[in-house]
C-alpha cells in the first residue's frame, strides 16, 4: 500500500471514530441501555437487523427495545419476548417474517439458558475473530435460525463481524469492548458494508466487490498494514468516507 493511501486511511479513521458517529449508526442502540448484559443483548439483536435503509430498520430495533422496556437481556432471558414476537408469517422487516425473528430469539434464549451469555458461549468455542464468527453462525444454524444469522462463513457475515467489532474493540467512543478479554482485536474481520467495499475499490485495496469471507479477509489484511494493532479502526475510515461521498 502506498504511503499516501496509508496516511489518508489513518486520517479518516481519526476523523470518523468519534462520538458524533453514533446518532446515525445502529451502534447507538447499545449505548441507549444500561448494564453490560443488556448492552450485549441489544447489540446482538440490533446487528441482526442492520441492513437496508436506516430509516426503515432503526424503528424495528427500537420496537424491540420498547417492547423490552429497555431491558432486552431480561426480555429474552425470561421469555417475555414471545408475546411481542409471535411465530407468524407476517412481515417483520423486509425478508424477515415474525416467525424468523421468533426462531432467532428462541435460539438466543436457549444460548443464554445454557451458557449464561453470548460472551460465555464464544469464550468456550473461540479465541480469534474468525473462530467467533464461525461459532456464532454454527450455533444459530443448529437451532434453525439461519434465515437471520448466516449458516456458515462462506459469505462475508457482515453483521456478525460488525457485532464482534462492537463487542471486542476497547478504548473507542463507539465500540464497547465488553469481550476484549476473550478475543484479540487484531484477529477481527472487516464488516463488508456497501460503502466500505465501494471506497476500498476506489482506493485500490480490493479488486472485487464479491461479498465473500475471502474478500473481507483481504481487506482486513490491507487494514493491518495501516493499523497493525487494531485493523478494524479502518472500518470507520472507509465507512465514513463512503457515507460522505453518497451525501454529496
Question: Where do the PLM segments sit?
Answer:
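HhH-family (HhH-GPD) DNA N-glycosylase catalytic core used in base-excision repair
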Residues: 1-248
Amino acid at each position: 500500500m502506498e504511503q499516501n493511501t496509508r496516511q489518508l486511511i489513518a486520517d479518516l479513521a481519526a476523523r470518523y471514530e468519534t462520538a458524533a458517529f453514533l446518532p446515525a449508526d445502529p451502534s447507538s442502540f447499545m449505548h441507549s441501555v444500561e448494564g453490560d448484559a443488556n448492552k450485549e443483548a441489544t447489540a446482538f439483536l440490533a446487528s441482526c437487523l442492520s441492513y437496508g435503509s436506516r430509516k426503515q430498520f432503526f424503528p424495528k430495533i427500537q420496537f424491540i427495545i420498547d417492547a423490552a422496556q429497555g431491558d432486552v437481556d431480561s426480555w429474552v432471558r425470561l421469555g417475555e419476548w414471545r408475546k411481542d414476537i409471535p411465530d407468524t408469517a407476517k412481515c417483520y422487516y423486509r425478508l424477515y417474517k415474525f416467525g424468523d425473528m421468533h426462531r432467532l430469539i428462541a435460539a438466543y434464549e436457549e444460548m443464554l439458558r445454557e451458557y449464561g451469555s453470548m460472551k460465555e458461549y464464544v469464550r468456550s468455542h473461540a479465541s480469534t475473530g474468525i473462530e467467533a464468527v464461525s461459532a456464532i453462525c454454527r450455533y444459530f444454524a443448529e437451532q434453525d435460525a439461519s434465515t437471520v444469522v448466516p449458516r456458515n462463513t462462506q459469505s462475508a457475515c457482515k453483521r456478525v463481524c460488525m457485532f464482534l467489532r462492537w463487542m471486542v474493540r476497547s478504548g473507542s467512543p463507539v465500540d464497547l469492548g465488553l469481550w476484549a478479554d476473550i478475543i484479540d482485536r487484531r484477529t477481527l474481520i472487516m464488516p463488508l458494508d456497501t460503502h466500505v467495499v465501494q471506497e476500498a475499490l476506489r482506493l485500490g485495496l480490493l479488486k472485487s466487490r464479491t461479498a465473500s469471507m475471502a474478500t473481507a479477509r483481504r481487506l482486513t489484511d490491507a487494514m493491518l498494514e495501516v493499523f497493525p494493532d487494531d485493523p478494524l479502526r479502518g472500518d470507520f475510515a472507509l465507512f465514513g468516507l463512503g457515507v460522505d461521498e453518497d451525501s454529496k
